[in-house]
């Protein structure tokens, strides 16, 4: 499973750790992803969303057990 936000597409960044002797080793900076139950096209799905999209309100979270309550009614 890719470490990528399902909403904005944010993924890992690649860079270098540079020592005083100018030796370089690769480093990866991963996005802060959360697995969230959200409504997508009217259905409840698990999506991986970065915290920036969560704070911006781009995702409508579903309360735990809400899909079962609607199925009973």
Swiss-Prot record:
Which domain of life does the protein's organism represent?
Bacteria
GO function terms (MF aspect) = structural constituent of ribosome
The Gene Ontology CC terms held by the record are: ribonucleoprotein complex; ribosome
| Alphabetized InterPro entries for the sequence | Bacterial_rp_bL28, Ribosomal_bL28, Ribosomal_bL28/bL31-like_sf, Ribosomal_bL28_bact-type, Ribosomal_bL28_sf
What GO biological process terms are annotated to this protein in UniProt? translation
Per UniProt, which keywords does this protein have? Ribonucleoprotein, Ribosomal protein
* Family affiliation: Belongs to the bacterial ribosomal protein bL28 family.
Q: Which HAMAP family match?
A: Ribosomal_bL28 (MF_00373)
Name used for this protein in its record: Large ribosomal subunit protein bL28
């Amino acid at each position: 499973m890719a470490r990528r936000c399902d909403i904005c597409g944010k993924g890992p960044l690649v860079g270098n750790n540079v020592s005083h002797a100018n030796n370089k080793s690769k480093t990866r900076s991963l996005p802060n992803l959360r697995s969230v139950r959200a409504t997508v096209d009217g259905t409840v799905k698990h999506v991986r969303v970065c915290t920036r999209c969560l704070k911006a309100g781009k995702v409508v979270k579903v309360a735990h057990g809400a899909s079962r309550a609607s199925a009973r009614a």
